[in-house]
A protein has these predicted regions:
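Ligand-binding loop in jelly-roll beta-barrel domains
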Residues: 86, 97-138
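Double-stranded beta-helix
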Residues: 1-20, 119-142
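Well-ordered beta-strand positions in beta-sheet-rich domains
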Residues: 55, 93, 114-116
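Glycine- and acidic-residue-biased ligand/ion/polar-headgroup-sensing regions
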Residues: 50-51, 58-101
Length: 142
């Protein structure tokens, strides 16, 4: 019952919800520059000092060193490869009790040093969401 009480019912039925809340992805750098380095990255949540998120795509066959100024959690959405020393892959099916290689936490020290992401696929990109907590120094609120 508590959860039902905290829902904003008016916002959930707002016919103009998208117009009021949609955030167009914002590239972190020039797409031409990052694509030449084998990756693309965009801010997808960037209006709150309390949390933010980016979508990172590492192109097929590319190896990219990705640097951030803050720790983050990562969820893999597509592809397989390596992230630092770890194998990463997107599971097609998860059964109860099975471990997966699609969620990781990156410490601030590792993020600042840079995380090497290797995509061995000839056809599929690696796509991941990176979510940050409060006070991300890379975030420019707009």
């Amino acid at each position: 019952e508590y959860l039902l009480d905290i829902l904003d019912w008016e916002a959930n039925v707002d016919p103009d919800f998208a117009a009021r809340h949609f955030l167009r992805p914002r590239p972190v750098r020039s797409v031409a520059e990052t694509r030449a380095e084998g990756w693309e990255e965009s801010w997808i949540s960037y209006r709150s000092p309390d949390f933010s998120a980016k979508e990172l795509t590492v192109l097929p066959g590319a190896t990219a060193t990705i640097r951030d100024a803050a720790a983050y959690g990562m969820i893999l959405l597509q592809g397989h490869g390596r992230m630092g020393p770890w194998d990463v892959d997107t599971p097609a099916l998860i059964r109860f009790g099975q471990l997966t290689s699609d969620e990781f936490f990156v410490t601030e020290a590792a993020a600042v040093r840079g995380v090497v992401v290797v995509n061995p696929s000839r056809t599929d990109p690696i796509v991941m969401l990176k979510h940050f907590g409060p006070g991300n120094p890379d975030l420019a609120l707009t």
